[in-house]
Swiss-Prot record:
PROSITE patterns: FTSK (PS50901). It comes from the Bacteria. This is Uncharacterized FtsK-like protein all7666. Pfam families: FtsK_alpha, FtsK_SpoIIIE. Keywords: ATP-binding, DNA-binding, Nucleotide-binding, Plasmid. It comes from Nostoc sp. (strain PCC 7120 / SAG 25.82 / UTEX 2576). Belongs to the FtsK/SpoIIIE/SftA family. Although strongly related to FtsK, it lacks the typical transmembrane domains located at the N-terminal part of FtsK. ATP binds at G382, R383, T384, R385, G386, G387, K388, S389. Residues 363-556 form the FtsK domain. GO terms for molecular function: ATP binding; DNA binding. Probable DNA motor protein. May track DNA in a ATP-dependent manner by generating positive supercoils in front of it and negative supercoils behind it.
Length: 725
């Protein structure tokens, strides 16, 4: 048969003869390898490739026509997947399936082919081949041709190769000083949403470099409309304020000083800075002028300078060393993308665990050091669309990607069930993400017990009091991991009547001494209600992160200062105040997990598979066993309620009952110290009673009794009397 092929030059006839020969060889019992060997010896390479294709088709057809009544879809998917991997053409697969499958099965085949092409992991050879093809396109054609080639690719892994090449070429075009309109035109020419996004980001970088404001509008059909403000000269373009009269920063500063004089506030212009979110003008108040005069002048400035400075919202006014600053919102605001600040190259610093903070007015990246005594625990909050969730996700993503599980562990609570769900299943988690008040109470109780076991470990070694000292002595041979407990929307948790006592008690214990044991609490809420979040809890957070709030009092509660209302003037979407020993205004990093899911998922995959060369210290406390021990066998008879909460035990230890309806209160040392501490901080009587005894006016006679005791104790203390009542 092969001799007949050699003597005939008609290609189609040759293929038909080769098909017949292969079918006969299969019937004679020859294996695929034996058939290919014979073809390679007698025929040219082109026919060897054709023979391989024929064998794939025969094998695929044989699997579908096996002697059974019917096959399930799982088997069909497996057969299709093997055929695709073997290189069988889609049309050939569909043609064979049309002969052997029902209509429903045939429809399944079509969807299966689409899914396989989209999600299969290509071989290294295939990846290299696609990459070389893209390089050839870039070297010989405009970048639009690369866009078209990427759009024709179905597989997400091969597309990712193209996306990386697109970013490299866009960066080169940026260095070649291409105008903003060039990149927005590229975005409009591409149908791929990720390529559009990369082009728009580059346009934003050009706008930042040239000082030109950028207004990108997306139409209903996905097209991007560019609106640029035309500057009068290059000097103005390099300064940051956009307005109808086009002012330089120096001119804007002098105009601000003149306007302040109209309000009988004498000041002198000092300097100005361009930031990604706002422009900062610093002035020096004349001697004798109080800061209170300018503290709430923001709305008046909008009225007086709204047109000249482009003010649409009141600027934030703050005191800084050497003057007072006015933060003027930028009309061409820039965002800080997470991926632009981290490459995750090199080994992590296992002794200095930190989380991303943001970018300050100078464009400098600022991190939040959890290992610092000025941080340890963080209280944060702000209204919807303030950027709180993005800040939290950036912190988690950074921690799991930068540090292995032996260095950092996570305890997450998400009662909204929408923020932390993407992180479930990570090896860094000490327990599954808590999604209700009960599971959060269990998680916090577990951390309290873990804290105690860590301090017991410290006691076994002389001169060790903190996790920093422990790791300094024993790491890297044995490292005690830091545990970051991040709680989203604590308002719902602390409003739960069944579990609020347990949660409050556990939080108080953790905030009191868990920082030294390497357990850090990050507590966030949209509603920082002073009647819900215990004052004693709020006062034990050394660090605060305040996102934009709706009410001035919310700003005061988060920042721990009843006079600091500045969070009301924040711009939202990641603009926040970071307070420790000083207050910084930062732009939080934007994770963009919805805009760029491939990058987000890639970091999660790397976090799961990262190398962990360290040996972690283990307390031996198993979460599931610990939770089971919290409930006794009779829990089913009392509807699963916790036997005796720590809060109840604490309250009983502070009271000496003398009958059913009357009792004498005797304050122990802990209660006296707590009362004095809160009193010195300016807390009112009802706030102290709530913090120390967990009682409010709704508790009736019990509340009145304890309130009288606290009041008498404070009066006696002022008068030099006895502490006990």
């Amino acid at each position: 048969m092969l001799e007949m092929y050699i003597n005939n030059n008609n290609t189609e006839f040759q293929k038909q003869q080769l098909w017949t020969a292969i079918v006969q060889a299969k019937q004679d019992g020859l294996s695929n390898e034996e058939i290919i060997e014979n073809v390679q010896e007698a025929l040219p390479d082109a026919m060897v490739f054709y023979a391989e294709t024929v064998l794939k088709q025969i094998d695929f057809r044989a699997k579908l026509s096996r002697p059974v009544v019917e096959f399930n879809l799982e088997f069909l998917f497996q057969v299709i997947y093997e055929s695709v991997i073997a290189g069988t053409n889609d049309n050939e697969i569909l043609s064979i399936c049309a002969e052997h499958c029902t209509l429903n099965q045939y429809e399944f085949v079509r969807y299966a082919l689409e899914y396989i092409h989209l999600h299969r992991m290509p071989s290294q050879w295939e990846q290299n081949n696609v990459y070389q093809k893209m390089i050839e396109i870039v070297s010989s054609s405009p970048i639009e041709s690369l866009f078209e080639y990427i759009e024709s690719i179905k597989n997400i892994y091969l597309k990712q190769i193209g996306y990386e090449l697109v970013q490299e070429n866009l960066y080169n075009l940026l260095l070649n000083n291409k105008p903003i309109s060039y990149f927005t035109d590229l975005a409009n020419q591409s149908k791929d949403k990720f390529i559009k996004n990369y082009c728009c980001r580059t346009a934003v970088l050009v706008a930042r470099a040239t000082g030109k404001p950028l207004d990108l509008k997306v139409t209903g059909d996905g097209s991007i409309i560019l609106k640029e403000t035309k500057y009068l000269n290059s000097e103005i373009a390099n300064n940051g304020i956009v307005s109808s009269n086009i002012l330089t920063m120096g001119q804007a500063g002098k105009l601000l000083v003149d306007t302040l004089e109209d309000f009988n506030i004498n000041a002198k212009y000092v300097d100005a800075k361009n930031g990604p979110t706002f422009n900062r003008i610093r002035v020096k108040l004349e001697r004798g002028v109080s800061y209170k005069k300018v503290e709430d002048i923001g709305n008046d400035l909008v009225q007086q300078l709204g047109e000249e400075l482009g003010l649409k919202v009141a600027p934030m006014v703050s005191v800084v060393p050497g003057g007072v600053v006015f933060d003027i919102p930028r009309l061409d605001r820039q965002f800080a993308y997470f991926r632009d600040y981290f490459s995750f190259d090199g080994e992590p610093d296992i002794y200095s665990v930190s989380i991303p903070g943001g970018v300050d007015v100078d464009g400098t990246y600022v991190e939040i050091p959890l290992y610092s005594d000025n941080v340890t625990h963080i209280l944060g909050g702000g209204r919807t669309r303030g950027g709180k969730s993005q800040f939290e996700k950036a912190a988690i993503l950074y921690l799991v990607r930068r540090y292995p599980p032996s260095v950092v562990r996570l305890a997450l609570s998400d009662v909204k069930r929408v923020t932390f769900g993407k992180f479930d299943g990570l090896p860094h988690l000490v327990a599954p993400v808590a999604r209700d008040a009960e599971s959060t109470a269990n998680l916090l109780d577990y951390l309290v017990e873990e804290m105690e076991l860590r301090y017991q470990e410290f006691e076994r070694h002389s001169s060790i009091e903190t996790i920093a000292q422990y790791n300094s002595r024993f790491a890297p041979d044995c490292i005690m991991p830091r545990v970051i407990c991040l709680i989203d929307e604590c308002f719902d948790l602390l409003s739960d009547d069944n579990y609020c006592d347990r949660i409050e008690t556990a939080l108080m214990k953790l905030l009191a001494k868990a920082g030294g044991a390497g357990i850090h609490v990050l507590l966030y809420t949209q509603r920082p209600d002073k009647n819900v979040i215990d004052p004693l809890i709020r006062s034990n957070f050394p660090a605060k992160t305040a996102f934009v709030t709706t009410r001035p009092e919310d700003s005061c509660i988060i920042l721990g200062d009843d006079k600091d209302k500045r969070a009301v003037y924040l711009l939202g979407y990641g603009d926040f105040l970071y307070k420790t020993t000083e207050v910084l205004r930062l732009q939080a990093l934007y994770v963009a997990d919805d805009e760029d899911p491939e990058y987000f998922q890639q970091l999660l995959l790397e976090a799961k598979n990262q190398n962990d060369p360290y040996t972690a210290w283990k307390s031996g406390l198993d979460f599931d066993e610990f939770v089971a021990s919290l409930y006794d066998e009779s829990s089913s008879n009392d509807n699963g309620k916790f036997k005796a909460t720590t809060a109840t035990k604490t309250k009983q230890s502070k009271t000496d009952f003398e009958g059913s309806f009357s009792f004498k209160v005797q304050l122990d040392e802990e209660a006296r110290n707590s009362i004095m501490n809160l009193h010195q901080k300016g807390y009112q009587l009802d706030e102290i009673v709530k913090a120390v005894f967990n009682l409010s006016r709704q508790d009736g006679r019990s509340y009145k009794k304890f309130r009288n005791v606290v009041e008498e104790f404070l009066n006696n203390f002022k008068g030099g009397g006895e502490d006990d009542i």
